UniProtKB/Swiss-Prot annotation:
Cofactor binding annotation: Binds two Mg(2+) per subunit. The magnesium ions form salt bridges with both the protein and the DNA. Can also accept other divalent metal cations, such as Mn(2+) or Ca(2+).
Assembly, per entry: Homodimer.
Extra remark: Eukaryotic topoisomerase I and II can relax both negative and positive supercoils, whereas prokaryotic enzymes relax only negative supercoils.
Organism of this sequence: Leishmania chagasi
Protein name, entry field: DNA topoisomerase 2
Site positions (Important for DNA bending): 826
Signal peptide (residue range): none
Record function comment: Control of topological states of DNA by transient breakage and subsequent rejoining of DNA strands. Topoisomerase II makes double-strand breaks.
Annotated positions for site Transition state stabilizer: 774
Positions with a binding annotation for Mg(2+) 2: 517, 519
């Protein structure tokens, strides 16, 4: 490809189709928390919907056209209705009466006005900048975007006795000629737009609208009806009929936990709009619904801020009144009791983009009497719960403890705070600001001290922050008592808790300079410092811009090759990447500064030589309190989820403009703090396709790359992985991750990707009892290349870390590893808990999808499981599961426990049993448990544990399994999936199948290249053997020309693969072998062409299944060998077997697999009894052999009468089932019938 061919010029239509996000927002369906109308409850509910913003926007454009017509319909022609119809196929029709478009030809453009307005970009009637205009349209895109992003689009316009018809197809490229007819002038003017969105382009699998999007559009149309309540708005012929805005606001009222309803909403309506404050009896994250001229601003804007300012102002006034009486109102928590609705009519509104998600222009709010809202707030029933006594006493106690408020001498201060290096001058000299530099740890402190000049040390002190800073939002002084770092910082500055500061003049230092690493953790420390000061002393920051300042150091330095040897420092990756684009052919070496410890003392002196040049001043205003509250307040989880959902998960750079000398709180939060949040989530939340977190992926990549069969010490291996994969965090955390990836005890990994050689932990402490990394060894397990085939490697998308390609963004294993091993992680605003499932069950699920079953069908039948577990997992309520251990009840209160839920450690279980002994429930304990098996005999007090339910509960033998998933989607965005794991299966299935297609294509291409090389070699050899090439007398140039003349292929732009062969290569034997290689390669190509991607997948699944079955057999045998050969005999065992593996698909040989936990009985069952029927009085034999995880395979005909997809056909031991299900069944009554 030439450089010129890379550059293209697109038509406007093609540009919209290729880059729709620039015009209508993202066309990727994303989980979005929002208000939605619940028809069963008859009110709004807050739910997470799967929303396609692009699709929503193109529908919105047509709705807004109909709404804009209300303002155009004045005088005698009034608009009376807007009618919307959404068909089952997804075709949408919007019709309205009113003024309508004139059906005349434009003299300038030679076409009818409807054709211009709906079929040509950049046409509009809103270009006159009318200062009184209240329409939503501004840019001339609107309905044309809907036309372009639809498969068909038609318009009917009737005005002044004329009616026009026109339609478009092929994304507005093809248009029918306008058809204009005469009609009765008395007929009402009508505009009817009908269109079919291109659902495939928006990523909808069935090319039709989803149920979630129907509900979202229903809510959107309700908002329109509330905005324009004077006209009738109907959906599918059903009018909404809001008589007043108060009717609409009442839909947001949420009943309390006891069913009581909150007070009526506070609603104020004026000619330019309505504002409603809807009280709720329980707290929730701050929620605002904003609409401007009919446009729903999903990201808020100036009108939403103004409405919150009104509420803040009233609450502040209320708080002052309470303060006079020695009380304080927690205004932040009171705010969380309100949902705010802002519906405004504004002249010439301006939005942040064509998608109009945020209003940016100045707004005029309805003028409401301030004291009216204050009186309303005073009557709120929840207000008293947030009126507390002043924290003065606690603040005074803490001030005494830390010595705050006292003027301490430098000597006394240093003895109190040993880490503080105080400025040598006690007073500022008028020219220099007395500054306290706080650093991230001692190494950064050393850099600062070594770099400051003697003159600078007169007015600059240095204090290192050690340990984790706490979040002290909402003046949490009790929590502050536990944070020594912040206490010492406040003492160093001379700050007193509970005191209001308006100037830093009375403090020991007049500026706080934060000097941290330029990575995500450094951003977090900056955020916590800013949060603490804004929470405790907001006026100090608001009245003194730059009191908190940030010190910026380079994150990348490059040394340009050449005579100049120029060194260029970059303070952001954005500037570095911009330089790279501007100098594509430049040669340079780069040094990355992820921590301050990377800088030399000489470099540090450069930073401080022009100290003010590297400082950014933080500016804070009163409105920033709400934003910081959203980021740091524990109650604002939903806000943080929305914040993270909208952010790009793989944003690798801090996007702050370092050339500016000031930084606002919104800039810091949305451009730097978000970086920490994204990185924190990336570390904690797994990827949906490979189930790995970044550190796990780095380890796996390094181990796959190593190709070694010998085990290495974990401590040494971590060093290799850290260097090879550019891991920038402590090796201790990497070693811990390596250990966890190798653990294979029951409840650890179902598939351990690394081999544990040594003590890697056990069920005793769920792996926490592993030996030190310097004593244990590991290597890649046999599953490594089975799950991550080497043929995949060239097709993966690799990360660029410090100019070097390292691990891929994500792997695409043959199985969804997230389901095989599960995942637990807590990120920023998000957490994930996904249990593990049996790998062979997951393999069967993938086979079922290959056979045509949907992900939702398949996932419905998966049950959490840990390999080696000998108990039972049963379904509970609300998508929960319950893992139950295995135990046997004997006469005289004796119990034998042989299994516990795999999430519980043996030590924790032993501690629980000991507590029962202390309570005199358990009278005797005999513990024979090993590292990985449970074997405990108990004798309980007579009368205790009389029912099966009590046994499970009191002995902690049952544990709930919750599924609450959040994962990174294939595109790298955070996707909450809750308890529905079907997206994980579907995402993995789509990616893996696509990879097989690409792998097959690549392999065929490589084999064809090999074939061409072999054929060229044969052609040259034949000419040589026939004497047509005089090899001995030929020059290199002559041989090269001969190869060109013969039409031989080049390899790496040369013919060396032929010309540098040894002379023995031209013998008859070699020639015959060459011919055989050609025939073999041709046969392989033909065989590969006949092999489908699905067949390739099934072949690799068969290899994995066979290997894992052998691995599981060995593992279970090892567990059973550790168990006692005999224990207390006789008794009733519950449960005796696991629910069967539900039929999920056929294997390659047409057989269907089931997993059954078998149980044998001392008395032979009746000859006519079928498996699973009642057993009468037979009792299980403790000495009888039990097979755990046995795989029974039979032909499909053998199981044709079974319906394993149905939960009703699960195999159970009827005796245990009957005893467990007998209402109030007591062991005292039941045991005589079943025990001898």
């Amino acid at each position: 490809m030439t450089y010129a061919s890379k550059y293209k010029k697109l038509t406007p239509i093609d540009h919209v189709l290729l880059r729709p996000e620039m015009y209508v927002g993202s066309i990727e369906t994303q989980p979005t928390p929002m208000y939605i109308f619940d028809p069963e409850k008859g009110r709004m509910v807050w739910e997470t919907m799967r929303v396609n913003q692009g699709l929503l926007k193109i529908v919105d454009e047509i709705l807004l056209n109909a709404a804009d017509n209300i303002n155009n319909s004045k005088g005698s022609v009034r608009q009376t209705y807007i009618s919307i119809h959404i068909s089952d196929t997804g075709e949408i029709t919007v019709e309205n009466d009113g003024a309508g478009l004139p059906i005349v030809r434009s003299r300038e453009h030679k076409m009818y006005i409807p054709e211009m307005v709906f079929g040509h970009l950049l046409t509009s009637s809103n270009y006159n900048n009318d200062s009184t205009s209240t329409t939503a349209g501004r840019h001339g895109y609107g309905a044309k975007l809907t036309n372009i992003l639809s498969t068909k689009f038609s318009v009917v316009c009737r005005t002044d006795g004329r009616e026009s018809h026109m339609s478009w197809t092929d994304h507005m490229r093809m248009a029918t000629a306008p058809r204009v007819n005469r009609v009765d002038p008395k007929e009402k003017s009508v505009t009817r737009v009908k269109f079919m969105p291109d659902y495939a382009h928006f990523g909808f699998p069935n090319a039709s609208i989803s149920l979630d999007m129907k509900r979202v559009l229903h809510k959107r149309i309700m908002d329109l009806a509330a905005m324009f309540s004077k006209i009738e708005v109907r959906l599918n012929n059903v009018p909404f009929g809001f008589r007043t805005f108060t009717d609409y606001a009442r839909l947001y009222s949420l009943p309390g936990l006891d069913g009581s309803m909150p007070p009526e909403p506070f609603v104020y309506t004026s000619p330019n709009g309505s504002v409603a404050y809807v009280p709720q009896l329980t707290q929730s994250p701050k929620r605002i619904v904003g609409v401007v001229n009919g446009v729903v601003t999903y990201n808020g804007g100036t009108h939403c801020n103004a409405a919150m300012d009104i509420l803040d102002s009233c609450l502040d006034s209320l708080s002052k009144n309470f303060k006079k009486n020695g009380k304080v109102v927690d205004t932040n928590r009171v705010q969380r009791h309100f949902t705010v609705l802002v519906f405004l009519i504004q002249t010439q509104p301006k939005f942040d983009s064509q998608s109009k998600a945020r209003l940016v222009s100045t707004v005029t709010m309805p003028r409401m009497p301030k004291n009216t809202l204050e009186k309303y707030l005073e009557r709120m029933p929840f207000l008293e719960a947030h009126v507390n006594s002043m924290d003065d006493q606690l603040a005074n106690e803490l001030n005494k403890e830390i010595g705050a408020g006292r003027r301490l001498s430098s000597k006394t201060l240093i003895s109190a705070i040993t880490k503080l290096v105080d400025a040598t001058s006690s007073q500022p000299d008028g020219r220099n600001i007395r500054t306290l530099i706080i650093t991230e740890g001692d190494s950064a402190k050393a850099l600062a001290l070594n770099s400051l000049s003697s003159e600078q040390k007169k007015y600059c002190g240095v204090f290192p922050l050690r340990g984790k800073l706490l979040n002290v939002r909402n003046k949490n002084l009790k929590r502050l008592k536990t944070c020594k770092g912040l206490q010492d910082l406040f003492l160093s500055l001379g700050l007193e808790l509970g005191k209001e500061y308006r100037s830093p003049a009375e403090l020991r230092y007049q500026r706080l300079l934060v000097m941290t690493d330029q990575d995500a953790d450094g951003s977090h420390i900056k955020g916590l410092v800013i949060n603490a000061f804004e929470s405790l002393w907001p006026k100090l920051l608001q009245n003194n811009p730059g009191y908190i300042s940030l010190f910026s150091t380079p994150i990348v330095k490059i040394k340009v090759s050449g005579k100049s040897k120029e060194v260029i420092a970059f303070h952001s990756f954005r500037d570095f990447h911009r330089w790279q684009r501007a100098h594509p052919s430049a040669r340079y070496t780069a040094k990355y500064y992820k921590g301050l410890g990377t800088s030399t003392t000489a470099e540090g002196k450069e930073y401080f030589a022009d100290m003010e040049k590297n400082i950014m001043q933080l500016t804070v205003d009163a409105r920033d309190h709400q934003l910081l509250d959203s980021v740091f307040d524990a109650a604002e989880v939903e806000w943080r989820k929305e914040w993270m959902t909208k952010a790009n998960a793989f944003q690798g750079e801090v996007d702050i403009d370092r050339s500016k000398k000031t930084l606002t709180i919104p800039e810091f939060v949305h451009k730097e703090m978000v970086h920490f949040a994204l990185v924190g989530n990336a570390r904690a939340i797994p990827h949906c396709v490979d189930g790995l977190k970044p550190s796990q992926r780095k380890i796996l990549w390094a181990m796959l790359r190593r190709h070694n069969s010998e085990a290495s010490k974990v401590a040494q291996l971590s060093g290799y992985i850290s260097e090879a994969s550019a891991f920038h965090h402590g090796e201790a955390s990497l070693q811990e991750t390596i250990v966890k990836m190798a653990q294979n005890f029951t409840g650890g990994n179902n598939i351990n990707l690394l081999v544990p050689e040594g003590q890697f932990g056990s069920r005793q402490q769920l792996g926490n009892d592993h030996a030190a990394p310097r004593y244990i060894f590991t290597k890649l397990s046999r599953f490594g290349r089975l799950l991550f085939p080497e043929e995949d490697d060239p097709l993966l998308d690799y990360m660029d870390e410090e100019g070097t390609f390292v691990e891929p963004h994500h792997y695409v294993p043959i199985l969804p590893m997230l389901l095989c091993n599960g995942a637990v992680g807590i990120g920023f605003g998000f957490a994930t808990t996904i249990p593990s499932f049996h790998p062979l069950d997951v393999s069967a699920a993938v086979r079922a999808m290959i056979n045509g079953e949907s992900a939702k069908q398949v996932v419905r039948n998966l049950v959490p499981w840990a390999v080696g577990f000998q108990g039972t997992v049963r379904r509970g309520p609300d998508n929960e599961f319950i893992a139950v251990g295995k135990y046997t009840a004997h006469p005289n209160g004796r119990f034998h426990i042989s299994e516990i839920p795999w999430m519980t450690s043996i030590e924790a279980f032993r501690l629980h049993i000991s507590s029962l002994a202390s309570a005199d429930v358990v009278q005797r304990i005999a513990d024979y448990s090993g590292a990985n098996h449970i074997d405990i005999d108990l004798i309980v007090r007579d009368g205790s544990l009389t029912t099966w339910a009590e046994c499970e509960t009191d002995l902690a033998l049952a544990q709930r399994i919750y599924i609450n998933g959040t994962v990174f989607s294939p595109t790298g965005t955070l996707s909450p999936i809750d308890s529905d794991l079907s997206p994980v299966l579907q995402w993995h299935y789509d990616r893996r199948l696509d990879l097989y297609k690409r792998r097959r294509t690549r392999k065929i291409g490589l084999m064809k290249m090999d074939l061409a090389r072999l054929q060229s070699t044969r052609k040259f050899v034949e000419h040589f053997r026939q004497g047509q090439i005089d090899f001995l007398n030929a020059t290199d140039d002559t041989l090269h020309k001969t190869c060109v003349k013969l039409g031989l292929v080049r390899v790496d732009e040369s013919f060396d693969y032929i010309l540098k062969k040894p002379i023995t290569f031209f013998t008859r034997t070699s020639t015959e072998k060459l011919q055989a290689d050609i025939a073999k390669t041709q046969a392989q190509i033909e065989e590969l062409k006949r092999t489908t991607p699905v067949k390739m997948w099934l072949t690799e699944l068969d290899k994995f299944d066979k290997t894992f079955q052998e691995y599981e057999r060995v593992l279970i045998n090892s567990i059973q060998k550790e168990q006692r050969s005999s224990s207390i005999t006789g008794g009733v065992e519950l449960p005796a077997l696991r629910q069967p593996l539900l039929m999920l698909g056929a294997s390659a040989k047409g057989a269907t697999a089931y997993r059954v936990h078998a149980c044998q009985y001392e008395k032979p069952p009746p000859s006519k009894r079928r498996p699973g029927e009642s057993v009468g009085g037979a009792r299980p034999s403790d000495s009888a052999a039990r097979t755990v995880g046995k795989r029974l395979v039979g032909s499909r005909s053998e199981f044709k009468n079974k319906k394993p997809m149905s939960r009703k056909n699960n195999v159970k031991v009827s005796l245990s089932t009957r005893v467990a299900q007998x209402p109030g069944a007591q062991l005292g009554r039941l045991l005589p019938h079943v025990l001898m």
